[in-house]
Design a protein with these regions (language model features):
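Well-ordered beta-sheet/strand-loop patches within structured domains
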Residues: 1-187
Length: 187
């Protein structure tokens, strides 16, 4: 049996293949107010260069309060605002009264909240494994710093491990693919 085991209090992940630990890496987990849930699931797919649709909790607790003070928050964070017709709305047209009527999307890139890669699995918490734009966090001893998702220290190596397809998806190809900022869904 092959599986990933995340030890939340130890801030670590191990990959187990046929009973042997084949990979170990540091992770960042949810902070005290937005803890990473304990769950068991099966990986459904891997996204290279993913867009990030900002979840309601992060909008309400982080984005909206900052945007009220400074509309340029959307531009600084490279967030696009879309109405229900999928038309882009200017940050200067944005009003807090209408804030929940819109979708907020961060385009892919090394500095996006999801970084270069996201691993999806079914769960009721809307959490996943992903890269990060805060790579410096892995130097810290205390790493309960995310909004619930698990951030990976070596995300592209984990993608290679999960894909297990050296012929079609070696690490070099995964790295090259993330350099072009083109969204790709795998597996």
């Amino acid at each position: 049996t092959n599986y990933l085991l995340i030890n939340i209090p130890d801030y670590s992940l191990v990959a187990i293949k046929d009973g042997d630990t084949t990979q170990k890496q540091r992770v960042v987990v949810g902070k005290k107010t937005r803890q990473t849930p304990v769950l068991e699931s099966k990986i459904s797919n891997i996204n290279l260069n993913p867009n990030w649709t900002v979840p309601p909790t992060i909008l309400a607790e982080d984005v909206f309060p900052d945007a009220i003070k400074d509309r340029n928050k959307f531009n600084k964070d490279k967030l696009k605002i879309y109405n229900w017709k999928k038309q882009e709305i200017s940050p200067w047209e944005w009003k807090i009264e209408d804030a929940n009527k819109y979708h907020y999307v961060q385009l892919p890139g090394r500095n996006s909240a999801l970084g270069l890669m996201k691993i999806n699995f079914k769960n009721k918490y809307s959490v996943y494994l992903h890269d990060t734009n805060h790579r410096d966090y892995f130097k810290f001893t205390y790493r309960a710093l995310s909004s619930g998702c698990v951030r990976l220290e070596k995300p592209l190596e984990m993608a290679e491990y999960i894909l297990n397809d050296e012929e079609n998806w070696p690490l070099e190809k995964i790295q090259d693919t993330t350099n072009i900022n083109h969204y790709i869904k795998l597996k």
